[in-house]
């Protein structure tokens, strides 16, 4: 009994400085963004061109429309309502997302790509609800 207490005391004094799994937590905004970007690329299909943008005239942006949609979905998934908080958190990921756009550009492009975002969401729901099921689902 005394030996167990001594071992527990030793373990209680140990301090974890860095978790090994810290990089892969689901509140990691970049991890969620990367997963949603891959899903959006698979689902978008013919809605976007090879660079991930809706076909339109003008300069091709470095931060694609699919990346804007994925960033929007990631911020909603994490529960970030404020754009200032979103861009404050994104400063931690400047290395991972080098072509990040400004808040003003994000707002403008998010409004432009809102229909694309809705279509991708509808296709996601269709994939989840109907395509992977063999029997009808009761709602």
Residue ranges and their predicted role:
Residues 2-139:
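Short alpha-helical elements
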């Amino acid at each position: 009994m005394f030996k167990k207490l001594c071992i527990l005391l030793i373990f209680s004094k140990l301090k974890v400085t860095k978790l090994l799994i810290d990089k892969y937590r689901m509140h990691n905004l970049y991890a969620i963004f990367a997963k949603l970007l891959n899903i959006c690329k698979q689902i978008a299909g013919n809605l976007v061109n090879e660079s991930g943008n809706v076909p339109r005239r003008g300069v091709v942006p470095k931060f694609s429309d699919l990346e804007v949609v994925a960033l929007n979905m990631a911020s909603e998934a994490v529960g970030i309502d404020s754009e200032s908080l979103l861009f404050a958190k994104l400063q931690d990921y400047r290395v991972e997302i080098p072509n990040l756009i400004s808040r003003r550009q994000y707002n403008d492009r998010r409004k432009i790509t809102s229909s694309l975002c809705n279509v991708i969401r509808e296709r996601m729901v269709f994939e989840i609800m109907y395509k992977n099921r063999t029997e009808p689902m009761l709602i």
